[in-house]
């Protein structure tokens, strides 16, 4: 899994620990944030990293939006994870191009504390649009991207891999 902030200055204001996230139920009200998560679908690390943040964001009065063009969320998983099912909104069966536009519009509204979108590779212009929309709506936007298998012929990619065997 590789995470990459698309808005570096946000993290330049000091360390933001998990304790701070747990104490602050107004996450996303100070600044918007766009971050890209590249992950391996066979390893649960992304869910384990994102779930505490999503649980905290679920305490806000705003919605949590999932833009999933290819798949449908499992209601059973949502309930088991403790996420507020009544605050979840999912848009599926939309084209990847429309997903970028939908994510931008959703972030701008301020109606969502977080928008998770499974998007294709983005241009710098698209990233900038999403960052501005997140700032305007004071929301988190997570660009979710399953990891493509990296072939040795393409060289070494600088990524952090968290293996599921490290978790009990």
Swiss-Prot record:
Residues 106-112 are annotated as: FtsZ binding. It comes from the Bacteria. Is rapidly cleaved and degraded by the Lon protease once DNA damage is repaired. One of its GO terms (biological process) is SOS response. Residues 161-168 are annotated as: Lon protease binding. InterPro entries: Cell_div_suppressor_SulA, P-loop_NTPase, SulA_CellDiv_inhibitor, SulA_enterobact. Induction: By DNA damage, as part of the SOS response. Pfam families: SulA. The record marks 168 as: Essential for degradation by Lon protease. Disulfide bonds: none annotated. Keywords: Cell cycle, Cell division, DNA damage, Septation, SOS response. Interacts with FtsZ. Component of the SOS system and an inhibitor of cell division. Accumulation of SulA causes rapid cessation of cell division and the appearance of long, non-septate filaments. In the presence of GTP, binds a polymerization-competent form of FtsZ in a 1:1 ratio, thus inhibiting FtsZ polymerization and therefore preventing it from participating in the assembly of the Z ring. This mechanism prevents the premature segregation of damaged DNA to daughter cells during cell division. Belongs to the SulA family. This is Cell division inhibitor SulA. It comes from Serratia marcescens.
């Amino acid at each position: 899994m590789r995470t990459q902030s698309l808005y570096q200055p946000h993290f330049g204001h000091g360390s933001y620990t998990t304790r701070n996230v747990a104490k602050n139920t107004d996450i996303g009200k100070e600044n918007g944030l766009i971050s890209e998560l590249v992950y391996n679908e066979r390893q649960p690390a992304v869910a384990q990293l994102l779930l505490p943040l999503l649980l905290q964001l679920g305490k806000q009065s705003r919605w949590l939006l999932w833009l999933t063009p290819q798949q449908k969320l499992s209601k059973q998983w949502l309930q088991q994870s403790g996420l507020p099912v009544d605050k979840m909104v999912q848009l599926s069966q939309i084209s990847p191009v429309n997903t970028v536009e939908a994510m931008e519009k959703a972030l701008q509204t301020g109606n969502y504390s977080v928008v998770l979108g499974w998007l294709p590779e983005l241009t710098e212009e698209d990233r900038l649009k999403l960052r501005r929309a997140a700032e305007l709506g004071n929301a988190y936007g997570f660009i979710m991207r399953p990891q493509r298998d990296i072939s040795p012929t393409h060289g070494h990619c600088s990524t952090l891999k968290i293996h599921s065997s490290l978790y009990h």
